[in-house]
Regions:
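C-terminal transmembrane helix-loop-helix hairpin of multi-pass membrane proteins
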Residues: 3-12, 17, 27-29, 79-80, ...
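N-terminal signal-anchor module of multipass membrane proteins
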Residues: 1-123, 129
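Transmembrane alpha-helix boundary signature
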Residues: 152-167, 179-190, 209-220
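C-terminal ends of transmembrane helices
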Residues: 72, 121-135, 176-191, 236-252, ...
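Internal active-site segments that recognize and position negatively charged phosphoryl groups
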Residues: 190-273, 277, 281
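Cytoplasmic-side transmembrane-helix entry/capping segments in multi-pass membrane proteins
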Residues: 135-146, 165-168, 189-201, 251-263, ...
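Structural signature of hydrophobic alpha-helical transmembrane segments
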Residues: 100-120, 159-175, 217-234, 284-299
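Central hydrophobic cores of alpha-helical transmembrane segments in multi-pass inner-membrane proteins
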Residues: 68, 116-127, 147-151, 172-179
Length: 349
C-alpha cells in the first residue's frame, strides 16, 4: 500500500541490533554489583610530564618513593685499647698527685698544696682551650690562668674558709674573657656560641681551688683523701673496662661502654668505704656516701666530655691537639669532683 514506507518504521532500533557502546543495565532495574575491577581495552600510558610541586617540599612523582635508596648506617667508632689504657694511667697519676698533695697541707702550710693545685689548673687550661678552641684562644687562656692564681691566693689568704672569694674570682675571670673576645671584630660573631665553652673553662679552673678551701676546714684533708681516691679509682676502672669490654655501647660515635661507667662508680664507692674504716672521723657508711657522689660525678663528667668531642667531630670541626683532647676527660672529672667533695663535707660531715 505504501511502497515508500520502510518496514522498520515503528520498531525500536535497539531491539535487534546491540549498541556499539558499552552495554548498560536494563531499563527499570538497578545496576548489578561489581565483582572486580573494570577491564580496560588499552593500558594506561605511563605518565611523563613535569613533576608536581608539593607544598613545602620539592616536586616528585608518585613512583619516586621506590627509587629512594635506604640510608647507610654509620659504622661505630672503634675503641682503641692503647689509648684507653693511656688515659686510665693519666687519671690514676692525677688522682695520686692530688691525694698526696693534700697530705702536705697543714695549719700555716697551705702553699705547697696550692702550688700543686695550680699546676693541675694549668693542665686544665691547656687541655680545655685547645680542645674547645673558643674565640681569642690566647686571651681566654691567659685570663683563665690569671683567674687560677687569684682563686688560689684567695683560698689561702682569706680569713674565713669559704667559697665567696672563689665566686668573685670566677665572675671577674668570665667577664674579662668575654670582653677580650669582643675586642676583636673577627671573634665577635662567635662570642655568643662560645659563651658556654668559656664559662666551662673559667669555672673549671676555679673549681680546683675548692680543694684548697676544703683543706682548711676540720676533716677536710680526710674528705679530700676519700673523695679524690673514689674519683680516681672510678676513672681508672672505667677506662680499663672500656679497653677490655666496651659493652654495651652508649652511642656509635662515642667509644665508651656503659659497663665501664657503672663498674667504675661501684668500685670507687667500695674503695671509699674501705678508706672510711681507717680514717679518723669517718665510718664506712659516711665514707661510702661521700665517695659515691664523687665517683659518679667524675665518671659522668668524663663521659660528657666524650659526647662533646663526638659532637664537634660530627659538626665538621677539625680535630685538635691529640694530647689535649684525651687529657680533657680526666681533668674535667676531677674538676667536678672537687666542689662535690666540698659540698658533701660541709653538708653531711
Amino acid at each position: 500500500m505504501f511502497p515508500s514506507t520502510s518496514r522498520d518504521i515503528g520498531r525500536e532500533p535497539w531491539a535487534d541490533d546491540p549498541s556499539a557502546g558499552p552495554s548498560g543495565p536494563a531499563r527499570g532495574y538497578p545496576p548489578a554489583p561489581r565483582t572486580g575491577p573494570a577491564e580496560e581495552e588499552g593500558e594506561r600510558p605511563e605518565r611523563k610530564g613535569p613533576r608536581r610541586l608539593r607544598k613545602g617540599g620539592p616536586g616528585r612523582r608518585p613512583d619516586d618513593e621506590s627509587d629512594e635508596e635506604p640510608e647507610e648506617e654509620v659504622p661505630p667508632v672503634p675503641v682503641r685499647r692503647p689509648l684507653a689504657l693511656t688515659v686510665a694511667g693519666f687519671a690514676a697519676l692525677l688522682g695520686v698527685g692530688l691525694v698526696l698533695g693534700a697530705q702536705t697541707s697543714g695549719p700555716g702550710h697551705r702553699l705547697p698544696f696550692a702550688a700543686i693545685i695550680f699546676g693541675v689548673q694549668l693542665l686544665f687550661v691547656l687541655a680545655w682551650t685547645m680542645a674547645m678552641r673558643p674565640p681569642a684562644l690566647l686571651v681566654v687562656a691567659l685570663v683563665s690562668a690569671a683567674t687560677a692564681v687569684i682563686a688560689d691566693v684567695a683560698a689561702v689568704q682569706s680569713d674565713i674558709a669559704g667559697l665567696a672569694p672563689l665566686g668573685y674570682a670566677a665572675a671577674a675571670g668570665l667577664l674579662l674573657a668575654v670582653l677580650g673576645q669582643l675586642v676583636r671584630r673577627v671573634d665577635r660573631v662567635r662570642v655568643t656560641d662560645s659563651l658556654g665553652g668559656t664559662l666551662l673553662i673559667v669555672v673549671g679552673v676555679v673549681a680546683f681551688g675548692t680543694l684548697v678551701v676544703l683543706s682548711r676546714i676540720p676533716k677536710g684533708t680526710q674528705a679530700i683523701t676519700v673523695c679524690l681516691t673514689a674519683a680516681g679509682v672510678a676513672l681508672l676502672v672505667a677506662r680499663l673496662t672500656d679497653a677490655v669490654a666496651p659493652w654495651p655501647r652508649l652511642a656509635p660515635q662515642v667509644p665508651r661502654g656503659a659497663a665501664g661507667v657503672v663498674v667504675g662508680a661501684m668500685l670507687g664507692t667500695l674503695t671509699s668505704a674501705v678508706l672510711g674504716s681507717y680514717l679518723v672521723g669517718f665510718t664506712p657508711t659516711s665514707a661510702a656516701l661521700v665517695g659515691v657522689v664523687s665517683a659518679a660525678t667524675a665518671v659522668l663528667a668524663d663521659l660528657a666530655v666524650g659526647y662533646a668531642e663526638a659532637g664537634r667531630l660530627m659538626a665538621g670541626e677539625p680535630p685538635t691537639m691529640w694530647v689535649a683532647r684525651h687529657m680533657q676527660g680526666p681533668l674535667g672529672g676531677f674538676a667536678l669532683a672537687a666542689p662535690a667533695a666540698y659540698a658533701m663535707c660541709v653538708l653531711f660531715l
